[in-house]
């Protein structure tokens, strides 16, 4: 594949081959992954990808600065993708919801995401600047 996972390169399109191999090997319905760009302990870029065997989708990228607490960000993403796949019209909308939920969690102290569905949807459907503000 074209992705250099060990070197930490975050070229999302390069992960498509890895996702295809995972689907072939394990028979997953979806393969989903987040990509973090770490500029400092309190400043990260954040996006994700989803693949269903036919369509590969990359979310918009969020610039999270400052990060208040990363703990719970992965759980928030996982809950967001489950919610999104159950309620949104397509995998792209589901992924945008999950990434927005996780990005917002990075701005909250503690391991619980205390935002509403409406707040997540407002960020996911925002102006695409990718700037997380609370």
Predicted regions mapped to residue ranges:
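Conserved phosphate-binding/catalytic region of the ribokinase-like
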Residues: 2-134
